[in-house]
Amino acid sequence: MPPEGAAGPLGAARRGPTTPQFHPLRIRDVRPETADAVTVSFEIPPELRDAYRFTQGQFVTLKTHIDGEETRRSYSICVGTTDYDRDGELRIGIKRVRGGRFSNFAFDTLKPGHTIDVMTPDGRFFTHLNAEHGKQYVAFSGGSGITPVLAIIKTTLELEPRSTFTLIYGNRSVDAIMFAEELEDLKNRYMNRFVLYHVLSDDLQDVELFNGVLDQAKCAAFLDALVPADSIDEAFICGPAPMMDAAEAALKAAGVPQEKVHVERFGTPLPQAGVPAVEITDATPAADLEIVLDGKKRKLRLPYEGVSLLDVGLRAGLALPYACKGGVCCTCRAKVLEGEVRMERNYTLEEREVKDGFVLTCQCHPVSDKVVVSYDER
């Protein structure tokens, strides 16, 4: 999702704590990227350097109070792992969203010197790297979806000197391209190993293939003309939902195996940031619930309907990890050790993970009379 302390692949998990934890971090820098996008970097104290060690493609979750209500939002890290190893730089990309509660707060409020709660890195949008690999990677990205993809590209090109990377990046116009200069610098630095194609919907370009939107037909055209599907070892997709669906469908139709395709969906948190005010009485039909967190066990009652496993734990005062509450970010992932649950939504867990007992607790309701779930097995 390192060279330091890693036995095996360079992409092996680099994080310290099993369960993500919040720490107050001071903002080092706020840098404009486009008219509606900025990057924010944080100062990492020496004692937290290991805790915030990340894998390319991961994200952090920010937490603050807006109008008296706790609000969380996850943002992808946009620097390479080697950047962090060299100078401790932890930087995220934030794009202003119309009506977006947290993004507008970030634009209007976050300044150098301010402090905000930041969760340790999480996420699984990565592949394991190895200096001996000579792979061909491709990424389809759109808008702010470039944020984790940039970290993946930078890290891969530096740690796998025999691998190549092709990026197909869609935007409305030249002015809307995030990290435009940084991408050009990478293109110049790795002239024989990094290929960059910009696809613009509003600004006309000389080559017709580079005009329009990244729908399935456009993605398929790139695979036919410039990036042969049988040459792709691994593919990454991140951006607006229609673009991601289109790229995924095009890769599948071209014969790229599903296990070679990595997809990162940016989820919008559900409107309610707090815990639902569902009354749980002795008469409420509920299962027996046992939650394991940091080696400690807590027994609760989990109603069969109306409230999720995560919210029952939060209501009991447990510091359970979560971010989007929409079944997208995977921050609330845990493992069912006993019993059976059902999930309302699942946009991120793979089929094999579900078979192994992993669940998104923000989407979980009990099926059996007893459920034991562990956040220590993530």
Task: List PLM regions with ranges.
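Ferredoxin-reductase
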Residues: P9-T115, M119, N171-S173, E184, ...
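Iron-sulfur (Fe-S) cluster-binding segments and ferredoxin-like electron-carrier domains
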Residues: L314-A316, T331-R378
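Ligand-binding loop in jelly-roll beta-barrel domains
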Residues: D83-G88, N130-H133, E160, P366-Y375
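FNR/FR-type flavoprotein reductase catalytic core
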Residues: N104-E290
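C-terminal accessory/binding modules appended to enzymatic or scaffolding proteins
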Residues: T284-K325
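Iron-sulfur (Fe-S) cluster-binding modules
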Residues: M1-Q21, R26, D36, A253, ...
